[in-house]
Amino acid sequence: MERYEQLFKQLESRKQGAFVPFVTLGDPTPELSLKIIDALITGGADALELSIPFSDPLADGPTIQNANLRAFSSNVTPTLCFELLTKIRAKYPDIPIGLLMYANLVFHHGIDEFYRRCKDTDIDSVLVADVPMSESRPFRTAAMKHGIAPIFICPPDAEDELLREIASYGRGYTYLLSRAGVTGIERRGEKPLNHLVNKLREYHAAPPLQGFGISEPKQVKETLASGAAGAISGSAIVKIIEENLSQPEIMLKELTEFVSKMKSATQL
C-alpha cells in the first residue's frame, strides 16, 4: 500500500503524473509475459496493473478478452500467475503492483486466502471489477487485514454517496472511468472529469487514475489537465502484443516506445 503513497509523492516533487500500463499475466506465454513486463518498466511505467486470466471478463472489450484466451491456450493458471508475480516483485522491489480481478477467482480458494496470497507475493492493491461497492465489505475487509489496498471504480456518473464511500473505503488509488461500457480503444475516453476529480479530492479519496480508452499522449495530457493523478492504458498496449505475436523482439521494442511516449506526456 505504501508504495502508492511513495510514488505519488515522488511524482509530485518531479511535477509529473503517473502512467500505468495494464496487461494480462501469461499473455501470450508465461516466458514472454515476463519480458513484456521488463519492456513496460524500461519504457518508464510508474506502476503496473495486471490481471489474472479469467474466462468471462465482463468489463473488457475484445482486445483484452483475446489476451485472456491466449493466456489460457498457454495453460496459464492463477497458481502460475502468482509464480510470475513473485519473479516480477523480486526483480522490481519498488514498483507498485496492482491486480485487476473478477470475483470468481477471488472466491476460488476463499476471500481471505486470496488476499493472504497477495500479501505473501507483496502485491500492493486489488481491484475486483465485478463487485459493486454495496457488496464489497468482505473483500475490502480481507484486503485491509492483509495490508492490500482495496481499489474502487468511480464511474463517470457517480453520485455523491458513492464518491463518499470510495473516499472512505478506497486506498492506494481510485480507478476513474473515462466512460461507461467495456475497455477498448475503439471507443475513446469522453470529456475530462473535472467535477468528479474535485469531489474526490474534497472527500480525501485516494488519488484518481483515469482509465478506459486511453491510447494517445494527448489523452494523457487531458487526463492530467482535468486534475487526475495519472492515466491507465490497457487495450492500446495489449493491441501491440496482439499485432506482433510472431515477432516478439519488435513487440517488446514497440511496447517500450509506446510507454515512453505516454510517460513523456505526464510532465506537468
UniProtKB/Swiss-Prot annotation:
Record: active site? E49 (proton acceptor), D60 (proton acceptor)
Keyword Lipoprotein present in the record's keywords: the answer is: no
Could you confirm whether the keyword ATP-binding appears in this record? Answer: no
What is one GO cellular-component annotation here? cytosol
Q: What is its EC number?
A: 4.2.1.20
The GO terms describing molecular function are: tryptophan synthase activity
Q: Which UniProt keywords apply?
A: Amino-acid biosynthesis, Aromatic amino acid biosynthesis, Lyase, Tryptophan biosynthesis
Instruction: Identify the domain of life.
Output: Bacteria
Recorded catalytic activity of this chain's protein: (1S,2R)-1-C-(indol-3-yl)glycerol 3-phosphate + L-serine = D-glyceraldehyde 3-phosphate + L-tryptophan + H2O
Q: Which InterPro entries does this one have?
A: Aldolase_TIM, RibuloseP-bd_barrel, Trp_synthase_suA
Q: Which Gene3D superfamilies match?
A: Aldolase class I
Associated pathway: Amino-acid biosynthesis; L-tryptophan biosynthesis; L-tryptophan from chorismate: step 5/5
NCBIfam families in UniProt: trpA
Q: Give a short account of what the protein does.
A: The alpha subunit is responsible for the aldol cleavage of indoleglycerol phosphate to indole and glyceraldehyde 3-phosphate.
Protein family (similarity comment): Belongs to the TrpA family.
Summarize subunit and interaction data from the UniProt record for this chain: Tetramer of two alpha and two beta chains.
Query: What protein does this entry describe?
Result: Tryptophan synthase alpha chain
The species is: Photorhabdus laumondii subsp. laumondii (strain DSM 15139 / CIP 105565 / TT01)
Gene it is expressed from: trpA
